[in-house]
Amino acid sequence: MGNKTSYPELFFLFFTGSILGFFLEGIWRVIRTGSWENHSATVYGPFCIIYGFGTAALYRITADVSGMPLWQQFLRFAAVGAAVEYTGSFLQEHLFGSVSWDYTGRFLSLNGRICLSMTLMWGLLGILYSRICAPAATHFFETASHWPYRGICAVLSAAMAADLLLSAGALYRWRERQYDIPPRNHIEEELDAHYDNARMEEIYNNMVFQDRAK
C-alpha cells in the first residue's frame, strides 16, 4: 500500500464503503429492533455515505499506522472515525437543518454527534478493516490496473454526483416545505412533484429536522 491513493481508488473505497455501510446499519437495526431501517443518504441507491468517507479515511491511514503498537492503531482509527462522524453530522445540520443520529444522553457524548461507545466502535472497525479489507483492496487496485476500471470509475462518479445533487435538491425542498415555502421555479416544482413529503419520509425515515423535533 503506497503513500499516495489515486482518485479512482478513493472513489471505489467510498462507493463500496457506502454500500457496505448501508447494509451494516440495516442489519444492526434488525438485530436491535427486529425491523429494517433505511440509512441511505441518497434518493436512489443503497449509499450510506458517512461509511463511504470513513472507509476511504481508514484505508488512507492504514499504511501510516501499520508499524504502531495495536493500542495506538486502535486510538488512531477511533479518532479518525469519530472525526468523520462528527463532521458529517455537523454538515448535515448546518446545510439541511436535520440530523440522522443523535447520541445525546450517551456516555461522553459531544454535541450529540459522537459518543464514547461509537468512537470505540470506529476503533474496532478500523482494526478489522486494516487486517481484512485493506489488504484485499490493495490487491484489487494492483490487479485492476489491467482492467478498464478508470472508465468504470468515471461513469460511476458521474452517476453518484448526479444522485448526490438530486438528493441535495430534494432535501433542500423538503426542508423548505416544513415552513410552507412554495417552489420558486420549474426545477423546484419538479422536485416537489417527484419527492413529496411522504416519499422523503420513506427514504429518510431516521432523519429529524432539528427545530421540528423541539
Q: Which stretches of residues belong to each language-model region?
A:
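Aromatic-rich, lipid-facing transmembrane alpha helices and their immediate juxtamembrane interface loops
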Residues: 1-214
